[in-house]
Design a protein with these regions (language model features):
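Short, surface-exposed loop/turn motifs that are enriched in glycine and acidic residues
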Residues: 42-43, 212-215, 249-253
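Glycine- and Gly-Pro-enriched alpha-helical subdomains that act as flexible
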Residues: 78-116, 247-302
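Substrate-contacting helices/loops that form the catalytic groove of nucleic-acid
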Residues: 180-215, 272-301
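A cytosolic small-molecule/anion-sensing beta-strand core signal
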Residues: 242
């Protein structure tokens, strides 16, 4: 396979959104791309997921001060979270109770674990340097690739051997700032607008217009996580957040009502996965992780 090893002004891609859309590339009008592909050959959709998810985790880290991770599929997040310690129940339903977890690994365990069916084959974004614990967690899941500001040597070695050596590993310059004006072409017509630079943090929550002024810090944190997640979710979009992680995301629905139902149903499933009957299901030995996820979803839905 062809691998990109260094930063460049442009990268030629195999094809665009669909195999018939050729030629395809990503490029900069000025300067070099702020990325280095350390392994694999990411495609058009991979890069869309990578760049959108990176912005999400970067903003989560800036807003909360905690390591953040996102699980992206088809240019919307399936999960997003910060590195808050997991209790034993969540470790079990996320299938990470056999692994040592760093704060960054915990963030990805939460992001991946919230909606495991949607996260199957995801693209991962990490706010901090990918460590060995996070790489080991990524290595056991079906995934297309990862973007992070850096990788420890141990983590990079693990990821380079994933998917028979073709796993996509992207390093991004965390100091990169895009131009304040962005462009998009549709049907040969160019749209121009200022970037969405709104800063979503607790400074937005200083004025509480209700009789009760009680607003717990945990609730503020979760509200900010929801807002940042929705900033990078295709509209219409709805997000339920609890304890530092999205537990149900509805994306790209024409109806806000249907979108709310979709996100709410995912949140319901997240809660029901913690029921003792689900946690104690008798699994056959060596069942595939995807088969286990699908079975749990069907069992709960019935």
């Amino acid at each position: 396979p062809k691998y990109y090893k260094t930063m460049a002004k442009e990268l030629e891609l195999k094809y665009g959104c669909n195999p018939n859309q050729k030629p395809s590339r990503i490029f900069m009008q000025e300067g070099e791309l702020p990325i280095e592909v350390l392994n694999g050959r990411p495609g058009y959709i991979n890069f869309l997921d990578a760049f959108n998810s990176w912005q999400l985790v970067k903003e989560l880290k800036e807003a909360t001060g905690l390591p953040a991770a996102a699980s992206f599929k088809h240019v919307s997040p399936a999960g997003a979270a910060v590195g808050i310690e997991l209790n034993d129940t969540l470790k079990k339903i996320y299938f990470v109770n056999d692994l040592p977890l760093t704060p960054l690994a915990t963030a990805y365990a939460r992001a991946r674990g919230a909606d495991r069916m949607s996260s199957y084959g995801d693209f991962i974004a990490l706010s901090d340097t990918c460590d060995e614990a996070t790489a080991r967690l990524i290595n056991r899941e079906v995934s297309d690739g990862v973007i992070a500001p850096d990788y420890t040597p141990e983590a990079l070695e693990i990821l380079k051997n994933k998917r028979k050596g073709t796993y996509n590993v992207i390093k991004i310059d965390p100091a990169y700032c895009p131009a304040p004006i962005e462009h998009k072409d549709v049907f040969g017509i160019t749209f121009e607008q200022g970037r969405n630079e709104i800063r979503l943090d607790e400074s937005l929550l200083t004025h509480i217009p209700t009789k009760s002024q009680h607003f717990p810090d945990e609730a503020k944190r979760d509200l900010i996580i929801a807002l940042i997640t929705l900033k990078y979710t295709q509209s219409n979009s709805v997000c339920y957040v609890k304890d530092g992680q999205a537990i149900g995301i509805g994306a790209g629905q024409q109806s806000r009502i249907h979108c709310t139902r979709l996100a709410g149903n995912k949140a319901d499933i997240w809660y029901l996965r913690q029921h003792p009957k689900v946690m104690n299901l008798p699994w056959v030995e060596k069942i595939r992780r995807a088969d286990r996820d699908n079975t749990i979803d069907v069992y709960i839905s019935d």
